[in-house]
Amino acid sequence: MARLQEFYKEKVVGDLTAKFAYKSAMEVPRILKITLNMGLSEAIADKKIIEHAVGDLTKIAGQKPVVTKARKAIAGFKIREGYPIGCMVTLRGAQMYEFLDRFITVALPRVRDFRGISGKAFDGRGNYNIGVKEQIIFPEIEYDKIDALRGMNISITTTAKTDDEAKALLAAFKFPFRN
């Protein structure tokens, strides 16, 4: 079992139950999944960009991502239907907790000029989104072997009903929120 998963069961559930006066342990919010998404608009010109991005995301997440394709043609962006324009991976269970642990303890402190993450990036339904500007903050990516700096979106989906509950859940996992 992952370190953060044990921490959630032993400490976080009790703390959140006391804070929000839940009647059952099943009411306590938990993280359902983490989705990593890389949008690659440059992939229209060069197909190798998709391969490099898939390789990077595989190293970061520990599982192979799905290549996302354009749903409809947009002439202004020179995109036809079915063109590969990004890649994404969904993490659940033990892999999700392992990624979250590495993200909080290793990757976030490596961000340049890091002062904490915004507490306002909740969507109103208890889910949190973080934008990462460069993939080199992850220790699995070797700086010398990348072809270009690429950002990604990390979506954390929780069972929390409100943003306050979700923020309390992520704060219990030691997310470095800005004050």
Curated annotation (Swiss-Prot):
The keyword Repeat appears for this protein: no
Gene Ontology MF annotations: rRNA binding; structural constituent of ribosome; tRNA binding
Keyword Ribosomal protein: yes
Gene3D superfamilies in alphabetical order: 3.30.1440.10
Family of this protein: Belongs to the universal ribosomal protein uL5 family.
Alphabetized HAMAP family for the sequence: Ribosomal_uL5_B (MF_01333_B)
Function: This is one of the proteins that bind and probably mediate the attachment of the 5S RNA into the large ribosomal subunit, where it forms part of the central protuberance. In the 70S ribosome it contacts protein S13 of the 30S subunit (bridge B1b), connecting the 2 subunits; this bridge is implicated in subunit movement. Contacts the P site tRNA; the 5S rRNA and some of its associated proteins might help stabilize positioning of ribosome-bound tRNAs.
Subunit: Part of the 50S ribosomal subunit; part of the 5S rRNA/L5/L18/L25 subcomplex. Contacts the 5S rRNA and the P site tRNA. Forms a bridge to the 30S subunit in the 70S ribosome.
Protein name: Large ribosomal subunit protein uL5
